């Protein structure tokens, strides 16, 4: 067996890659529970890919057959109901773990030098994940799927000069139709998963090149023993692979509880209107995107005044796009001499809490019908969201920091 392994490794460096990225990749020994979510996102990605493949086998990507094929999967395909619930719940779980993964990066400065590229790859994954979720949202061909996609695609029409042509190009028709469904199906099932997997590989390669951050924001490569091994590092395998099994068990317990007992999640994962087939002549009472898009939808609706002769709808789209785009430049906005929130001053801590609260409340506001009071609150929270980033070069520089230890703490 060893000869076979050596023969393969001489031609395809499997063992070398395993050692570099697992058994001889030294990670900081003080990881806490916030570092579970990267591994959990990989687990959910595998779930989405596998369940997606099996669902595709019975799905009919046509306006005439899409809704009926979903009902067929739910009623007649053996364990089809389980596959669908695993996939729909997995989509929400994916965004839960990704948002927590991103928040951990914000807390511990995982975007700062030398991990700028790791952060950019991660944000690109987030962007592709949003596109993947949006494309997949149309596929059930229910009322909310149809009208939600209609609203989002029509937003591109607010762009001056090219807006209408861009909307037409995305739809492939003058209205959302079977043509739109077919191209969204192709993108959701083939194109975007390939891009997503490639970005995940790049994200991990970039991470393992510069090394993992830790709750203290200390570079463990600066303290090595006589063998060149970081004193505060432990091999990722077997220590953190076993460590992550605990998180996987807890996660699967909660995940399966949702799948088997609350798969609709009160209408947040599977909306009530989506149990009706798409009807272009009947508009739902309230159109809202899936919960993981609602913070940006709330920002879009918060803009109620046109500027420079351009309508409020256009500026809402600009604000929504800027809310995502500004995350990409975060590594160059933070001027703090320390990485971790543990050693930053009160201004940075209050700012991060205000940012997190504003994002969560915006998520709620985007999911409910708009009222004048809620619109005003959304405007205030949108201001707080952007202030966190725009003012960061100033408050991160003047904030009083604590001394950072030379080695990691417990």
Residue ranges and their predicted role:
Residues 1-93, 97-410:
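Membrane-embedded and interfacial regions of multi-pass energy-transducing membrane proteins
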């Amino acid at each position: 067996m060893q000869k076979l392994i050596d023969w393969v490794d001489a031609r395809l460096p499997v063992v070398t890659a395993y050692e570099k990225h697992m058994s001889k990749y030294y990670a900081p020994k003080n990881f806490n529970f916030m570092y579970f979510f990267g591994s959990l996102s990989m687990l959910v990605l595998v779930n989405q890919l596998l369940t997606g493949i099996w669902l595709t086998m019975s799905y009919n990507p046509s306006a005439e057959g899409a809704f009926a094929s979903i009902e067929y999967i739910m009623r007649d395909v053996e364990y089809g109901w389980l596959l669908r619930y695993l996939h729909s719940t997995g989509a929400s779980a994916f965004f839960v773990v990704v948002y927590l993964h991103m928040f951990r990066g914000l807390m511990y400065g995982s975007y700062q030098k030398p991990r700028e590229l790791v952060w950019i790859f991660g944000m690109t994954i987030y962007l592709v994940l949003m596109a993947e979720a949006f494309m997949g949202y149309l596929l059930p061909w229910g009322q909310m799927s149809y009208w939600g996609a209609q609203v989002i695609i029509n937003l591109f029409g607010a762009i001056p000069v090219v807006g209408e042509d861009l909307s037409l190009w995305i739809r492939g028709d003058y209205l959302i139709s079977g043509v739109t469904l077919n191209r969204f199906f192709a993108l959701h099932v083939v194109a975007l998963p390939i891009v997503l997997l490639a970005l995940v590989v790049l994200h991990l390669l970039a991470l393992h090149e510069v090394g993992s951050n830790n709750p203290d924001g200390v570079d463990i490569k600066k303290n090595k023993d006589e063998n060149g091994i970081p004193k505060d590092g432990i091999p990722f395998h077997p220590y953190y692979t076993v460590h992550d099994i605990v998180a996987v068990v807890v996660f699967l317990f909660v995940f399966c509880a949702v799948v088997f007992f609350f798969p609709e999640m009160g209408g947040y994962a599977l909306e009530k209107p989506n149990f009706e087939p798409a009807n272009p002549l009947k508009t739902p009472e309230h159109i809202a995107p899936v919960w993981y898009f609602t913070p940006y939808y709330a920002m879009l609706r918060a803009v109620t005044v046109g500027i420079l002769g351009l309508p409020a709808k256009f500026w809402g789209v600009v604000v929504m796009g800027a809310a995502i785009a500004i995350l990409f430049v975060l590594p160059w906005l933070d001027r703090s001499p320390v990485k971790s929130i543990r050693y930053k001053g009160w201004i940075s801590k209050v700012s991060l809490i205000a940012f997190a609260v504003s994002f969560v409340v915006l998520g709620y506001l985007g999911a409910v019908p708009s009222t004048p009071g809620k619109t005003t609150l959304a405007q205030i929270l949108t201001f707080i969201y952007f202030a966190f980033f725009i003012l960061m070069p100033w408050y991160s520089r003047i904030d009083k920091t604590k001394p950072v230890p030379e080695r990691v703490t417990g």
